[in-house]
Amino acid sequence: NEKLATGEIEVYVTDIEVLNTSKTPAFQIEDHVDTAEDVRLRYRYLDLRRPKMASNLRLRSDFTFALREAFHNREFLEVETPSLFKSTPEGARDFLVPSRMQPGRFYALPQSPQLLKELLMVGGVERYYQVAKCFRDEDLRKDRQPEFTQVDVEMSFVTQDDVMGALEQTLADAFGRMGVKMELPLRRIEYWDAMDTYGIDKPDTRFGLEIQDVSEVFRGSEF
């Protein structure tokens, strides 16, 4: 099969011993196979062999490496904060881990490294970053996951413009390593302009149906 990476290899068999039998795969290991998501997840080890999935893993690895390099070049220090910490309720519920040594007491998985990175700032680490695992015990939605990875960053003794400038340049360098050129500076929009124009503080500015204030048009009417 010349479509496979090893398709041109031929083997001349003189003896075969069957050590075990295998079931027919649940789906073909190809990108364009129409397979239900629950089947793909049940046979994840097969799904990861598909070229697209393997490429996604490689892309994530390469981009994470590029981010780390970009932060390192700007004298940021990567610090792994603990995954077992005290419960510090934020916007969601904590995942609790019972303590074997202290019955009835619990650790909590961090919703974010917020308190821990603040300790680093007090301790003299003025530029910190981490590719951090976060855990939030909340209902599953498109933009809500119980476990996710975020790039966590903190800087001391800086202004708002310092933070935005450093992150812009870091992202531009990382994307540049991936062959994507970013035009700097990135577009900036004031909070109230975003709310007045789009009705949300994180708008997709490609959306053409902007909010229009028609108060003057209907002033004095019963509408």
Q: What do the predicted segments below correspond to?
A:
Residues 1-223:
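Class II aminoacyl-tRNA synthetase catalytic cores and aaRS-like
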